[in-house]
């Protein structure tokens, strides 16, 4: 079953300076993190605060999901970090 993103929930995790979201491969959850630097690369004019990071995520959701799918297809692991070079 291909990776999907049926749950649009996302939140900013201040401890890791990243927006966390999940994808699903059948019944398996795949947690993803996209860090501040990666978000800044795809949305250069964003504000560096929680609302700015979440807005940058929302404005680029489809691009982020496409990149997350590519990162996921590289190999399964406990969680996945989307880095600036992935974009």
How would you describe each model-predicted region?
Residues 1, 37, 80-81:
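Intrinsic-disorder/low-complexity peptide segments enriched for small residues
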Residues 1-4, 8, 32-33, 48-53, ...:
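A generic short-segment signal for beta-strand/edge and adjacent turn/coil regions
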Residues 45-87:
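Acidic, low-complexity intrinsically disordered segments
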Residues 18-44:
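A short, structured beta-strand/loop element
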Residues 1-23, 28:
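Short, charged/polar N-terminal "headpieces" of proteins
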Residues 13, 20, 40-41, 65, ...:
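Amphipathic alpha-helical interaction segments
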């Amino acid at each position: 079953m291909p990776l999907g993103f049926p749950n649009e929930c996302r939140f900013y995790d201040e401890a890791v300076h990243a927006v966390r979201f999940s994808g699903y491969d059948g019944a398996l959850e795949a947690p993803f993190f996209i860090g501040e630097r990666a978000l800044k690369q795809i949305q250069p004019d964003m504000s560096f605060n929680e609302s700015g990071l979440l807005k940058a995520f929302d404005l680029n959701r489809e691009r982020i999901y496409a990149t997350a799918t590519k990162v996921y297809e590289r190999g399964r692991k406990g969680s996945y970090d989307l880095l600036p070079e992935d974009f």
